[in-house]
C-alpha cells in the first residue's frame, strides 16, 4: 500500500518546465524520469537497483520460511537455494516489491521535486532476475494557484455582537430541557414523547434483514426512522399494536428495498414524556452550582454569550475574508482526485464516529434512508471548498515566504499538548517537523488575510 505523498518543500512549477522529460541519476544507481502528460498529470518512471532488491527478497523469504516444508529439512528450515530451485525466486517478487516500493517511490517523487496530491497508479514495466526493476507511476500533482488580492479586503458579514434577553432565556431553556426526566405516561403518545417499541418489518409478507428491533427507544419527531414511520405512532398507547405502513425512498441503501412498500408490525411497550423542572432559583442552582439565584444565572450566561458572540463575529469576518481571497484567486485545472480524496476522508471520519457509537454503516443507511452516494454528495461541496481554500492559503504562505522558527514549532507543540491533554513528547512523536512547519506557515497566511480585512 502506497501512502499518500505530500512534499511541500519542493513544489514543481510547470510554467518553468521547458522540457517534456527530466532524467536524473542518483548515487544508488536509481534512474528517475518524469513525463508530463497533461496539466497536473504525468508519469514517473523509476528503477530499483539490486542493492535494494536483494535485502527485500531476503525479507520476503524470511516472512514465509517458517511455513515451508522440504524433504530432509525440518519445517521452517528450508535453505534458500533449495527454495529457489523448487519454486523459483520469482514467487518472492510480489512481497519484495511491497517491501521496497514505498521508499523507492517516495525517493523518486522527492528527487523530481513533485508535489503529489493523490494515490498513484503503479505499474511494473520490467522485473527480471538479477536486473534492476523498472516501474511507472501515474501521478496527479498540485495545481498552480494564481493569487489575486488577499490583503486589505472589505467584507460583509451577517453576524452581530449583540446578545438579547431572548438569547439568554433560550440558553436557560435548553439547560432546563436537558434536566428533564422521562416519566411513564398513561395516555396517548404525542410528538416529542418517547415510545419503547418492538417492530418487525416485511415487504410483501416477507421479513427482511435489519427490519427487526426489540425494546427500541424512539423519540417521535426525531426523524430517526424513514419518513412516515414516527407519525403513525402518534396517538398510540402502551400495549397497543400498530401496523405502520411506509414506502422506502427510491434512493434507499438496500437496493432490494428501495421504492418498495413495507409494513412494520409495532408493539408499544411504554410511552414516556418529558417532565421539566420549574424555572426558579432551585433550577438555577441545579444548572450551575456557582450561582444562588435565577437572576445570577442570567447575568453569568449573558457574559458567556457575549464572549461567544464576539468569537463568532470574529470567525465570521475571518471566514468571509478567506472566502473572498479564494474567490480572487485562480486555481489552474484543479484535479478532481483532490476533491475525491477529501470527500473520502470526511466520509471515513464520519463513519468512524458512527461506529464508535455502535452504529454500523449498514444500520446508519437503513435508519436514515440514505445511501453511500448520498453521503458522498453531502460532503462534496464542502470538500471542494476546503481543498480550494487550503491551496490558496498555501500559495499565500509561499508568496509571503512564511517559515516557522524553532521557537514557534516548540510553542505549537506545547499548545497542542495542552489542547489535547497529552505530553509534549507524544505530540512530537505523532507530528513530523514538516507538518508543524506547514501548519504554522498556514496560520501566518490566514493572519495576513484576516488582520488586514475590514467590515463594510
Swiss-Prot record:
It comes from the Bacteria. It catalyses: [protein]-peptidylproline (omega=180) = [protein]-peptidylproline (omega=0). It is found in: Cytoplasm. Keywords: Cell cycle, Cell division, Chaperone, Cytoplasm, Isomerase, Rotamase. Residues 192-277 form the PPIase FKBP-type domain. Signal peptide: none annotated. One of its GO terms (molecular function) is peptidyl-prolyl cis-trans isomerase activity. Its main location: cytoplasm. InterPro entries: PPIase_dom_sf, PPIase_FKBP_dom, Trig_fac, Trigger_fac_C, Trigger_fac_C_sf, Trigger_fac_ribosome-bd_bac, Trigger_fac_ribosome-bd_sf, Trigger_fact/SurA_dom_sf. GO terms for biological process: 'de novo' cotranslational protein folding; cell division; chaperone-mediated protein folding; protein transport; protein unfolding. One of its GO terms (cellular component) is cytoplasm. Its EC number is 5.2.1.8. Gene3D superfamilies: 3.10.50.40, Trigger factor ribosome-binding domain (3.30.70.1050), Trigger factor, C-terminal domain (1.10.3120.10). Involved in protein export. Acts as a chaperone by maintaining the newly synthesized protein in an open conformation. Functions as a peptidyl-prolyl cis-trans isomerase. Belongs to the FKBP-type PPIase family. Tig subfamily. Consists of 3 domains; the N-terminus binds the ribosome, the middle domain has PPIase activity, while the C-terminus has intrinsic chaperone activity on its own. This is Trigger factor. It comes from Streptococcus pyogenes serotype M4 (strain MGAS10750). The gene is tig.
Amino acid at each position: 500500500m502506497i501512502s499518500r505523498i505530500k512534499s511541500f518543500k519542493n513544489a514543481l512549477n510547470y510554467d518553468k518546465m521547458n522540457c517534456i522529460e527530466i532524467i536524473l541519476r542518483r548515487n544508488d544507481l536509481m534512474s528517475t524520469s518524469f513525463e508530463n502528460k497533461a496539466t497536473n498529470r504525468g508519469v514517473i518512471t523509476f528503477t530499483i537497483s539490486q542493492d535494494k532488491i536483494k535485502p527485500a527478497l531476503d525479507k520476503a523469504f524470511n516472512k514465509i520460511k517458517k511455513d515451508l516444508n522440504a524433504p530432509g529439512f525440518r519445517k521452517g528450515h528450508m535453505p534458500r537455494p533449495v527454495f529457489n530451485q523448487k519454486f523459483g525466486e520469482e514467487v518472492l517478487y510480489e512481497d519484495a516489491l511491497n517491501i521496497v516500493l514505498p521508499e523507492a517511490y517516495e525517493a523518486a517523487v522527492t528527487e523530481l521535486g513533485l508535489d503529489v496530491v493523490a494515490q498513484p497508479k503503479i505499474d511494473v514495466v520490467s522485473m527480471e532476475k538479477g536486473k534492476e526493476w523498472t516501474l511507472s507511476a501515474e501521478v496527479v500533482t498540485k495545481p498552480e494557484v494564481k493569487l489575486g488580492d488577499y490583503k486589505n479586503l472589505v467584507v460583509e458579514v451577517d453576524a452581530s455582537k449583540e446578545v438579547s434577553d431572548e438569547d439568554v432565556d433560550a440558553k436557560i431553556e435548553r439547560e432546563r430541557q436537558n434536566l428533564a426526566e422521562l416519566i411513564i405516561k398513561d395516555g396517548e403518545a404525542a410528538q416529542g414523547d418517547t415510545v419503547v417499541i418492538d417492530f418487525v418489518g416485511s415487504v410483501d409478507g416477507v421479513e427482511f434483514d435489519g427490519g427487526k428491533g426489540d425494546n427500541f427507544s424512539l423519540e417521535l419527531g426525531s426523524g430517526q426512522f424513514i419518513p412516515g414511520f414516527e407519525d403513525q405512532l402518534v396517538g398510540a398507547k402502551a400495549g397497543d399494536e400498530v401496523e405502520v405502513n411506509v414506502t422506502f425512498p427510491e434512493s434507499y441503501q438496500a437496493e432490494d428495498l428501495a421504492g418498495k412498500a413495507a409494513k412494520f408490525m409495532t408493539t408499544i411497550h411504554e410511552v414516556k414524556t418529558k417532565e421539566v423542572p420549574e424555572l426558579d432559583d432551585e433550577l438555577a442552582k441545579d444548572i450551575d452550582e456557582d450561582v444562588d439565584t435565577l437572576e445570577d444565572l442570567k447575568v453569568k450566561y449573558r457574559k458567556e454569550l457575549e464572549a461567544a458572540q464576539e468569537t463568532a463575529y470574529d470567525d465570521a469576518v475571518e471566514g468571509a475574508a478567506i472566502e473572498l481571497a479564494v474567490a480572487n484567486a485562480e486555481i489552474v485545472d484543479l484535479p478532481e482526485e483532490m476533491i475525491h480524496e477529501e470527500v473520502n476522508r470526511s466520509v471515513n471520519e464520519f463513519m468512524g464516529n458512527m461506529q464508535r457509537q455502535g452504529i454500523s454503516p449498514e444500520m446508519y443507511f437503513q435508519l436514515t434512508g440514505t445511501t453511500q452516494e448520498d453521503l458522498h454528495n453531502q460532503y462534496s461541496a464542502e470538500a471542494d471548498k476546503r481543498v480550494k481554500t487550503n491551496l490558496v492559503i498555501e500559495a499565500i504562505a509561499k508568496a509571503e515566504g512564511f517559515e516557522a522558527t524553532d521557537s514557534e514549532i516548540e510553542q505549537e507543540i506545547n499548545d497542542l499538548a495542552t489542547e489535547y491533554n497529552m505530553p509534549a513528547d507524544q505530540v512530537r512523536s505523532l507530528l513530523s517537523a514538516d507538518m508543524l512547519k506547514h501548519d504554522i506557515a498556514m496560520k501566518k497566511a490566514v493572519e495576513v488575510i484576516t488582520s488586514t480585512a475590514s467590515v463594510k
